[in-house]
Amino acid sequence: MATKTIKVTQTKSSIGRLPKHRASLLGLGLRRINHTVEVEDTPSVRGMINKVYYMVKVED
């Protein structure tokens, strides 16, 4: 059975943000603006996305 994935794109810079928010972006695998990654849809990933919702765009 295939696991569900989510596309996450960083839309804003991490410069000047809280260290925990920067760590969440790195945990998601995002490194620069307009960088897109596919991550598994798990509760921990959803939590990281919710923490930095103002800097990312999410597609199913």
Curated annotation (Swiss-Prot):
GO MF, one annotated term: structural constituent of ribosome
Binding partners and assembly: Part of the 50S ribosomal subunit.
Record-linked Gene3D superfamilies: Ribosomal protein L30, ferredoxin-like fold domain
Protein's UniProt keywords contain Transferase: no
NCBIfam families recorded: rpmD_bact (TIGR01308)
Signal peptide: none
GO term, biological process aspect, one: translation
Name used for this protein in its record: Large ribosomal subunit protein uL30
Gene Ontology CC annotations of this record: cytosolic large ribosomal subunit
Family: Belongs to the universal ribosomal protein uL30 family.
Keywords: Ribonucleoprotein, Ribosomal protein
Pfam families per record: Ribosomal_L30
